[in-house]
C-alpha cells in the first residue's frame, strides 16, 4: 500500500505490547478540508461506506485453513478508502474509520462532537451476524452528513441527536452492546468470538 500511494513509512509511538509497528502520516488535505471526529450536529445522518464484519469473517476463514477469499484479503490487506473520503469531503461533518469496530468508533465521533445518536440496527448490513458491528479491522468509513445532503448513495444507519445518549433501535429484536478495541488497554482474546476488554 505504501508503494502504491507513494507514502514513505516514518514515525514513532508507544503502546503496551511485545511488538510495536508504528505509522505516522503527514500530508496536505484534499481540497484543504480535514474530516475530523468532532463536527457531527443534531439532525445529521450517520452513514457507513460498506457492510461490517468482512475482516472478522476473513480471520475466521484464515484460521480454518481457507487459503483465499475476498474476506481474507480484506483482513490481511485492507485498502484505504481514499476515493470515498474524497467524495464525501465537501459534505461530511465528521468521519472516522471503523478499524476498532463500528459502534466503538462511532462513539468517538459522538463523544468528540458532544452529541448522541439513534442507531437503527436493522439497517446495518453485516457479513455473519449482528455482532459484526463490534468487529474491528474493516477499515471502512463511518461519517455524518447533513440530512439535506444525503442522496442515498451510502448506507444510512442512524441519526445524530442532541441528548448525548446512544439509543440502539431494532424491530428485529437485535440485542447488542458497544464493544470494540480500546487503545492503551490490555485486551485478552483468542478469536473474535470471545473478545473481552478488561
Please describe what each predicted stretch is.
Residues 57-74:
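Short, compositionally biased
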Residues 34, 147-153:
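Short, conserved charged micro-motifs
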Residues 76-79, 151-198:
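Acidic, Ser/Thr/Pro-rich beta/coil linker or hinge segments at domain junctions
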Amino acid at each position: 500500500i505504501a508503494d502504491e500511494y507513494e507514502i514513505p513509512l516514518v514515525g514513532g509511538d508507544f503502546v503496551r505490547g511485545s511488538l510495536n509497528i508504528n505509522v505516522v502520516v503527514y500530508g496536505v488535505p484534499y481540497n484543504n478540508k480535514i474530516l475530523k471526529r468532532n463536527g457531527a450536529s443534531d439532525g445529521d445522518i450517520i452513514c457507513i461506506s460498506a457492510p461490517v464484519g468482512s475482516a472478522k469473517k476473513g480471520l475466521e476463514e484464515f484460521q480454518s485453513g481457507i487459503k483465499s477469499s475476498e474476506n481474507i484479503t480484506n483482513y490481511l490487506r485492507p485498502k484505504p478508502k481514499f476515493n470515498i473520503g474524497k467524495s464525501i469531503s465537501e459534505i461530511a461533518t465528521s468521519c472516522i474509520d471503523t478499524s476498532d469496530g463500528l459502534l466503538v468508533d462511532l462513539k468517538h465521533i459522538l463523544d468528540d462532537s458532544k452529541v448522541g445518536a439513534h442507531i437503527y440496527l436493522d439497517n446495518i448490513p453485516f457479513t455473519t451476524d449482528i455482532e459484526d458491528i463490534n468487529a474491528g479491522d474493516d477499515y471502512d468509513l463511518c461519517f455524518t452528513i447533513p440530512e439535506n445532503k444525503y442522496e442515498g448513495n451510502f448506507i444510512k444507519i442512524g441519526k445524530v441527536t442532541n441528548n448525548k445518549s446512544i439509543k440502539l433501535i431494532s424491530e428485529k429484536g437485535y440485542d447488542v452492546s458497544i464493544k470494540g478495541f480500546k487503545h492503551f488497554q490490555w485486551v485478552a482474546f483468542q478469536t473474535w468470538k470471545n473478545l473481552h476488554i478488561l
